[in-house]
């Protein structure tokens, strides 16, 4: 009986905050090198084969058991005793089809592809957490899943990972993620309880008309003029049909038509995005986009084929208890003065929402901005940079969050 008590005490001996911070800082350069390797070789959604291999090889070196090829390139490592309680930490791995314009030594080696959303940082920080947690596995009473997922950037990799059972066996009870943010100072963390990020949808409108010579527009049904009217009129859906107190966005971001200056083309293609704080709001806007586009096309003797390709992401909603826990864990690493309680949601979207539809969770932003090194740009910008001092801080926050969550669940 005494031996059992002693063993239970050893299993539940909590790592001190100073230990978490120092052990994370000790491997800072290791984390940075992982990040830079991934940054040099960006891979788009569902093509993260080399990144996945790097994750697998690292977990193998750390003697962490893992499952691979989940959602094509996803990897899930497991630390702990394999029993309940179980929490998960998640990182995404995919890059963006953006040509990098920074001057960093380790910039993308692949033209037209860049880690402009910080997923290289997310993967490296979680690998850092894996190393620290594995070295202290004897202090873990429960199970920690490390979810490395593909295709956050529009591919709904989180949805596929969820459908393939990453939240089961053992069942995940809480899930946490960090996302770097270039517009808040390095060493700060921002989030809120409740709705944090919007539900999203893509838009594709193909306007079909009748082409002809530009000097004889009366013999054509001009899809360019018609498409332009559609773009303008869609903005009135937000300004005149939505409740002014209900956030919503319709942005047309791509317009393609024609190949010669003196020819009216027969088609014009429009693409864009819809954002709302509810999936019902997205559905309502989709309905009205279709009605408006088709009506304007008909009035101009054209046709409009309207579709919403890809995946409609649900809103990302932070569980109140998970945010309080995450905030407490971050405060112990960063200091209370470096926590930002966001007053409002933002209209970006995240497929982390697919996990929090199933289990309570919390998604937070980790500041990586620093004007001294020109790290002033937001994500999805070709000049996006990060202050890498944030990486070991992110690792420490992951570790502390995981241990506190298991402690509370126990």
Region roles according to the model:
Residues 1-13:
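N-terminal amphipathic/basic-hydrophobic helices that include classical n-h-c signal peptides
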Residues 10-115, 124-141:
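Acidic/His- and Gly-rich active-site-bordering loop/insert found
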Residues 76, 96-98, 103-114, 121, ...:
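Histidine/acidic-residue-rich, glycine-tolerant segments that coordinate divalent metal ions
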Residues 88-90, 99, 203-205, 363-368:
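Non-cysteine beta-strand/loop elements that form the S-adenosyl-L-methionine
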Residues 225-410:
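Metal-dependent amide/peptide-bond hydrolase catalytic core
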């Amino acid at each position: 009986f005494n031996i059992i008590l002693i063993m239970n005490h050893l299993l539940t001996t909590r790592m001190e905050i100073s230990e978490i911070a120092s052990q994370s800082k000790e491997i800072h350069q290791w984390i940075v090198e992982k990040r830079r390797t991934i940054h040099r070789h960006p891979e788009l959604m569902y093509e993260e084969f080399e990144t996945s291999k790097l994750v697998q090889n690292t977990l193998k070196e750390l003697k962490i058991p893992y499952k691979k090829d989940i959602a094509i390139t996803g990897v899930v490592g497991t630390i702990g005793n394999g029993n309940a309680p179980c929490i998960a930490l998640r990182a995404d791995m995919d890059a963006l089809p953006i040509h990098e314009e920074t001057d960093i030594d380790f910039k993308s080696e692949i033209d037209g592809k860049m880690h402009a959303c910080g997923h290289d940082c997310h993967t490296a920080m979680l690998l850092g957490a894996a190393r620290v947690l594995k070295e202290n596995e004897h202090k873990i009473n429960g199970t920690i899943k490390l979810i490395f997922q593909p295709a956050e950037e529009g591919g709904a990799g989180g949805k596929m990972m969820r459908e393939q059972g990453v939240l089961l066996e053992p069942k995940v009870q809480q899930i946490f993620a960090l996302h770097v943010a270039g517009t808040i100072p390095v060493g700060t963390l921002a989030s809120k309880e409740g709705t944090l990020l919007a539900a999203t949808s893509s838009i594709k409108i193909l306007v079909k008309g009748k082409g002809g010579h530009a000097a004889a527009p009366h013999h054509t049904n001009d899809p360019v003029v018609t498409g332009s009217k559609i773009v303008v009129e869609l903005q009135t859906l937000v300004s005149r049909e939505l409740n002014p107190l209900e956030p919503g966005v319709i942005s047309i971001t791509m317009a393609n038509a024609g190949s010669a200056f003196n020819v009216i083309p027969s088609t014009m293609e429009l693409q864009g995005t819809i954002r709302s704080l509810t999936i019902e709001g997205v559905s309502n806007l989709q309905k009205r986009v279709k009605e408006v586009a088709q009506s304007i096309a008909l009035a101009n003797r054209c046709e409009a084929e309207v579709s919403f390709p890809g995946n409609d992401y649900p809103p990302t909603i932070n569980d109140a208890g998970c945010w309080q826990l995450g905030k407490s864990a971050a405060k112990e690493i960063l200091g209370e003065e470096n926590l930002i309680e966001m007053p409002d949601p933002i209209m970006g979207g995240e497929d982390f929402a697919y996990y929090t539809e199933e289990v309570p969770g919390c998604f937070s932003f980790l500041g990586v901005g620093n004007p001294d090194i020109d790290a002033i740009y937001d994500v999805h910008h070709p000049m996006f940079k990060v202050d890498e001092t944030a990486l070991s801080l992110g690792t420490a926050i992951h570790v502390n969050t995981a241990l506190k969550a298991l402690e509370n669940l126990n």
